[in-house]
């Protein structure tokens, strides 16, 4: 029993060390991944794509956010408390919120996005001379 616990502990330590050593590469991959797929969810909702397509996209985002939160938690485990360790989970929460909204109430999200687009466009037209 002690050998199994020791082996699992060693593997966990190695995974955490790998995560911290390759932080720039991991964040450099996961942040754009989540950003692009969350934006794609918004595009799918506005274009009224099939719910299955939106759900598949959301599942990919949930996986990416989970990996990002696990990566950030390795920094919390060693006591590193910096701005990125708080911004990345907040960014992940926004991505999850967008995708939850897009999968559970796409009509509401579509109305909001169209309202936002019209509001921004009207302000821009008023600002021109």
Enumerate the language-model features and the residues they cover.
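Membrane-helix boundary elements
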Residues: 1-46
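Alpha-helical transmembrane segments and their membrane-interface exit regions
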Residues: 63-64, 88-98
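Short, highly charged, low-complexity non-transmembrane loops/tails of multi-pass membrane proteins
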Residues: 109-129
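A generic, lipid-embedded transmembrane alpha helix
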Residues: 59-75
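Membrane-interface helix-boundary motifs at transmembrane edges
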Residues: 47-54
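C-terminal halves and exits of single transmembrane alpha-helices
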Residues: 93-114
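Membrane-embedded alpha-helical transmembrane segments of multi-pass integral membrane proteins
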Residues: 37, 67-70, 95-98
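Non-cytosolic membrane-interface motifs at loop->transmembrane helix junctions
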Residues: 77-91
């Amino acid at each position: 029993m002690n050998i199994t616990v020791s082996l699992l502990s060693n593997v966990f330590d190695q995974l955490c060390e790998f995560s911290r050593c390759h932080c720039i590469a991991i964040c450099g991959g996961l942040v754009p991944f989540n950003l692009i797929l969350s934006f794609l969810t918004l595009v799918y909702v506005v274009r009224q794509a099939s719910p299955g397509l939106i759900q598949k996209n959301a599942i990919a985002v949930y996986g990416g956010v989970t990996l990002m939160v696990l990566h950030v938690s390795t920094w919390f485990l060693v006591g590193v408390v910096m701005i990125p360790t708080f911004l990345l989970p907040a960014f992940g929460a926004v991505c999850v919120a967008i995708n939850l909204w897009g999968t559970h109430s796409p009509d509401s999200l579509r109305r909001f996005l169209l309202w936002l687009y019209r509001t921004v466009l009207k302000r821009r037209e008023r600002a021109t001379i």
